[in-house]
Amino acid sequence: MINYDLTQIRAIVFDVDGVLSCSTIPMDSRGEPVRTINIKDGYAIQLAEKHGLRIAIMTGGHNEDIRLRYEYLGVEDVYLSCAVKVRTWEAFKERYGLRDEEIVYVGDDIPDYEVMQLAGRSEEHTSELQSRITI
């Protein structure tokens, strides 16, 4: 078991594709991604909110269905079409008076890397990404 001190964490920010949905995404007839969402993730998000954590979604995806799904779960901060996620990260922090070390970021791809470096905790593949890219 990994033991993290999460006592100062006030928020969790999630990417969507590959994190809250499968990384292999089929397309519909219009070329739009058809995302599958794990019901257990929804329960976990609601539980985290119930315990006072602020939850945010930060995705490069632009489909309004993403917003609807997470607003239905009570997530107020759903950021779509995030081309440069660090800008959205900074705006989110400023809006709620948060510091980097108070936020967990969960991402899995190159657009997440810069934010992962700022976050108090970041998960998923930071070291794997770091070994593959140069920014």
Region roles according to the model:
Residues 20-51, 60:
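A positional/architectural concept
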Residues 123-135:
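Single conserved hydrophobic/aromatic residue that forms the stacking wall/gate
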Residues 89-113:
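Conserved Lys-Pro-Asp/Glu-containing loop-to-beta segment of HAD-superfamily phosphomonoesterases
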